[in-house]
Swiss-Prot record:
Similarity annotation: Belongs to the eIF-2B alpha/beta/delta subunits family.
Positions bearing Phosphothreonine: T86
Region of interest: May bind the chemical integrated stress response (ISR) inhibitor ISRIB: 171-180
UniProt biased composition (Basic residues): 41-51
GO BP term, pick one: oligodendrocyte development
Residue span of region Disordered: 1-155
Biased composition (Basic and acidic residues): 8-20, 31-40, 96-121
Record's compositionally biased regions (Polar residues): 130-140
Protein's UniProt name: Translation initiation factor eIF2B subunit delta
Lineage of origin: Eukaryota, Metazoa, Chordata, Craniata, Vertebrata
Length: 524
C-alpha cells in the first residue's frame, strides 16, 4: 500500500517537472506576461491534481484497513500489487473518486458474499436456506409469534423447579385459555392448593397458609386490603421466628420468607402494592445490625411494618382525601367504577363536609364489586345511582367528572386498574368529561406496560357462569372444545386518557410518575 502511494507521487512529480521545464525556444530570453500567466495556470492545475491523488490514496488506505478488520486472515496486497487488481498493476492516476468508490463498494459486496458462503459451508446450510428468526419472514416483515416464550414446556418445567425446591405446592392450570393469554396461569377455586398439604410438616407458616387461602378464594380483594393483610401476616411470622444457631437474623429471615412469598404467588399473583411492601421489609431486614439482640430486632421490624401501614396507607388516604375534596363542588355528578376503598372514603368525607353531589356507581360482572360501594354510600346518605358498564355511555352526558381508583401506576404513566377502567376513560374522553385517578405513591412501580396482554391476571373462568334460578348459563362449558372463557382481572389505561392523578404528594399528571419514583429511590 505504501509503495503504491510512493510510486504515484513520484510519477506525479516527474510529470510536473517535465511540464514546468522551459520550452524549446524559451531559453535565453525573459518570459512575457502571457507566458507567466500560462505558467501559473499550469502550476495551479498540477497542485489540484496532486490534491486529488492524495485524496485517492487516503480512500484506498481506509479501504485496506476496513478489509483487514473484516477479514484479518486474508493476505494483504504486496508492494507491487493494487487493491482489486492483479500483481504488477499500478494505480491509474486518471481515476476519479466516483470510480474508486464504486470499485471499492463492489469489492466489499463480493467479500461479504464470500464470507456468507464460507459460513454456510461450515454450518452445513447454505445462506439462502438459513431459517429466519422467530417472528420474522423472508420479506423482512416481523410477525407476532404464535406461541410466547412462556408457553414453552421446557420453561414451564424450569419455573416449577423453584417451588419444588422450596417445598411449596403448585397449582395446575384450569380449563382452556384464550390464545392471547395462554402464557398467564388460570386457576379454579374448586381445586384447593392445601388439599394434599400437611400443615405440621410444612415449611409454610400457618398465618401464610390462611392468608393464601383467603387470597385464592377472593375473601380478601383490593390492593390496600391485600397489602395490609400481608403485613399483618408478616408480623406474626416475625414474632414466631427464632434465629438458628450459627446464623444471623438479617440473612436467615430473608431466606425463610422466600417460600412464603412463593406460596402466596401460587395462590394469587402478587399486586404491585404487595411487591413494594416486601421490598421494604427485605431492605429493613438486610440493614439490621448483627449486634442487636433477637427480640430487639424483631420488635423493630414489627414497628417498621406498623409504621409502613400508617404512613403509606392510612395517612396517605387522609392527604388524598383532602386534595380530592377541593375538586368536588356542589351540584356535581360523580361517576365511580367498582369498589375502591380510597374513592369511597373521599366521597364519604366530602359528604360529611357538607358538599352536595350525586354519585353514579358503574359496575360489571362477574365480581359486581360496585354493590359494596353502593351500600357504603347509601349508608352515608349520598344520593346514588347504580348501573352496569354497558349503559355508562347513556349517563355520561350528565356526569361532571369521573373518579377512579388504581391497582398500580406504571413508570410510563399508564394506570393499571380493574378491567373496564380503560373503557370508561375512553368513553369519558369522547364526552369531554375529566378523569381523575386517586392512587397512593406506594402503588407506583417501575414496570412499563402499554397493554394488558403481556402481564395480567386470569381469574376463575367458572365465575362467568350466570345462575338464574335452577338454570346455569355456560354449564359444562369445558365439554365444548371450541369454547374458551376469559375472565380478565386488570386492564391498562394510557396516560392520554387520564387528566389528573391525586396522590398524597399532591395533584400531578401521569408524566410525573418517573419523577416520584426517582425521588422515592433516592430517599431510600
Amino acid at each position: 500500500m505504501a509503495a503504491v502511494a510512493v510510486a504515484v507521487r513520484e510519477e506525479s512529480r516527474s510529470e510536473m517537472k517535465t511540464e514546468l521545464s522551459p520550452r524549446p525556444g524559451a531559453a535565453g530570453r525573459e518570459l512575457t506576461q502571457e507566458e507567466k500567466l500560462q505558467l501559473r495556470k499550469e502550476k495551479k492545475q498540477q497542485k489540484k491534481k496532486r490534491k486529488e491523488e492524495k485524496g485517492a490514496d487516503q480512500e484506498i488506505g481506509s479501504a485496506v484497513s476496513a478489509a483487514q478488520r473484516q477479514d484479518p486472515i486474508r493476505e494483504l496486497p504486496g508492494p507491487g500489487s493494487q487493491l482489486g487488481g492483479t500483481a504488477g498493476e499500478k494505480l491509474p492516476a486518471g481515476r476519479s473518486k466516483a470510480e474508486l468508490r464504486a470499485e471499492r463498494r463492489a469489492k466489499q459486496e463480493a467479500e461479504r458474499a464470500l464470507k456468507q458462503a464460507r459460513k454456510g459451508e461450515q454450518g452445513g446450510v447454505p445462506p439462502q436456506a438459513c431459517p429466519s428468526t422467530a417472528g420474522e419472514t423472508t420479506s423482512g416483515v416481523k410477525r407476532v409469534p404464535e406461541h410466547t416464550p412462556a408457553d414453552d414446556p421446557t420453561l414451564l418445567r424450569r419455573l416449577l423447579r423453584k417451588p419444588d425446591r422450596q417445598q411449596v405446592p403448585t397449582r395446575k392450570d384450569y380449563g382452556s385459555k384464550v390464545s392471547l393469554f395462554s402464557h398467564l396461569p388460570q386457576y379454579s377455586r374448586q381445586s384447593s392448593l392445601t388439599q394434599y398439604m400437611s400443615i405440621p410438616s410444612s415449611v409454610i407458616h400457618p398465618a401464610m397458609v390462611r392468608l393464601g387461602l383467603q387470597y385464592s378464594q377472593g375473601l380478601i380483594s383490593g390492593s390496600n386490603a391485600r397489602c395490609i393483610a400481608l403485613l399483618h401476616a408478616l408480623q406474626q411470622v416475625i414474632q414466631d421466628y427464632t434465629t438458628p444457631p450459627s446464623e444471623e437474623l438479617s440473612r436467615d429471615l430473608v431466606n425463610k420468607l422466600k417460600p412464603y412469598i412463593s406460596f402466596l404467588t401460587q395462590c394469587r399473583p402478587m399486586s404491585a402494592s404487595m411487591c413494594n411492601a416486601i421490598k421494604f421489609l427485605t431492605k429493613e431486614v438486610t440493614g439490621m445490625s448483627s449486634s442487636k439482640r433477637e427480640e430487639e430486632a424483631k420488635s423493630e421490624l414489627r414497628e417498621a411494618l406498623d409504621r409502613y401501614v400508617q404512613e403509606k396507607i392510612v395517612l396517605a388516604a387522609q392527604a388524598i382525601s383532602r386534595f380530592a375534596s377541593t375538586k368536588i363542588s356542589d351540584g356535581d355528578v360523580i361517576l365511580v367504577y367498582g369498589c375502591s376503598s380510597l374513592v369511597s372514603r373521599i366521597l364519604q368525607e366530602a359528604r360529611v363536609e357538607g358538599r352536595r353531589f350525586r354519585v353514579v356507581v358503574v359496575d360489571s360482572r362477574p365480581r359486581l364489586e360496585g354493590r359494596h360501594m353502593l351500600h357504603s354510600l347509601v349508608r352515608a346518605g349520598v344520593p346514588t345511582s347504580y348501573l352496569l358498564i354497558p349503559a355508562a355511555s347513556y349517563v355520561l352526558p350528565e356526569v361532571s367528572k369521573v373518579l377512579l381508583g388504581a391497582h398500580a401506576l406504571l413508570a410510563n404513566g399508564s394506570v393499571m386498574s380493574r378491567v373496564g377502567t380503560a373503557q370508561l376513560a375512553l368513553v369519558a374522553r369522547a364526552h369531554n368529561v375529566p378523569v381523575l385517578v386517586c392512587c397512593e405513591t406506594y402503588k407506583f412501580c417501575e414496570r412499563v406496560q402499554t397493554d394488558a396482554f403481556v402481564s395480567n391476571e386470569l381469574d376463575d373462568p367458572d365465575d362467568l357462569q350466570c345462575k338464574r334460578g335452577d338454570q346455569v348459563a355456560l354449564a359444562n362449558w369445558q365439554s365444548h372444545p371450541s369454547l374458551r372463557l376469559l375472565n380478565l382481572v386488570y386492564d391498562v389505561t394510557p396516560p392520554e386518557l387520564v387528566d389528573l392523578v391525586i396522590t398524597e404528594l399532591g395533584m400531578i399528571p401521569c408524566s410525573s410518575v418517573p419523577v416520584v419514583l426517582r425521588v422515592k429511590s433516592s430517599d431510600q
